[in-house]
Amino acid sequence: MSNTGFRFKQFQVNHDRCAMKVGTDGILLGAWADVMQAKQILDLGSGSGLIALMLAQRSSAESRICAVEIDPAAAQQARENALASPWKEKIQVYQQDIDSFCTQTAQRFDLIVANPPYFEAGIACRDDERNTARYFTQSHLHWLQTAQRCLAPNGKISFVLPLAAGETLLKTTALYCIARCDVRTKAGKAPQRVLLTFAMQPQPLKHSELIIYDAQNQYHEDFVTLTQDFYLNF
């Protein structure tokens, strides 16, 4: 990965005008979220458009994706990334805050995804864009409740979060967690991230685990399997 962009098998993500660069969290969510039967998809806080592009690759030809990003420079770059991809007809980018979009839209979505801000408010940050991307004071519960406003009755919401933040969200939301994947950066280490899927109706929980690196510091086979449609070296 360079400071200007990241090349995947079927598309390029330029991110030099985005506060948050392409990273493992977004790649995990884009590869893990369940796109089966998802015709209308919403990516909240889209940044460079990474997750929207991954879901465009994985979803059916009939699927349509709305990518919402508050920062003007990032939204424009996400739009350019989408237009340069094989799925420019599937992705529409909106430069808007998530509250306004989810309040104003009449669309109801089958799948909503987000890699929301995760650092605590009050910590000094180097520039305003990164402050917006990483330190925004809205809670993860607020993000989930905002997403729920435009969720279809049988729709799903998928987040990627630090483990502690995910545990807190599970205790505070009234939605049902129907899928959970605990992510270990390395075999033998405690999980640091969690992928969560919520729904409005109860379903049996699908609980799994993913390891990124094995004990020999090589990519674990499960991580390769999950992401092999995207990474050039897999």
Curated annotation (Swiss-Prot):
Its EC number is 2.1.1.223. It comes from the Bacteria. The keyword Methyltransferase applies. The keyword S-adenosyl-L-methionine applies. It is found in: Cytoplasm. InterPro entries: DNA_methylase_N6_adenine_CS (IPR002052), SAM-dependent_MTases_sf (IPR029063), Small_mtfrase_dom (IPR007848), tRNA_Adenine-N(6)_MTase (IPR050210), tRNA_adenine-N6_MeTrfase (IPR022882). It catalyses: adenosine(37) in tRNA1(Val) + S-adenosyl-L-methionine = N(6)-methyladenosine(37) in tRNA1(Val) + S-adenosyl-L-homocysteine + H(+). Keywords: Cytoplasm, Methyltransferase, S-adenosyl-L-methionine, Transferase, tRNA processing. One of its GO terms (cellular component) is cytoplasm. Its main location: cytoplasm. One of its GO terms (molecular function) is nucleic acid binding. One of its GO terms (biological process) is methylation. It holds the Pfam family MTS. Belongs to the methyltransferase superfamily. tRNA (adenine-N(6)-)-methyltransferase family. Specifically methylates the adenine in position 37 of tRNA(1)(Val) (anticodon cmo5UAC). This is tRNA1(Val) (adenine(37)-N6)-methyltransferase. It comes from Aggregatibacter aphrophilus (strain NJ8700) (Haemophilus aphrophilus).
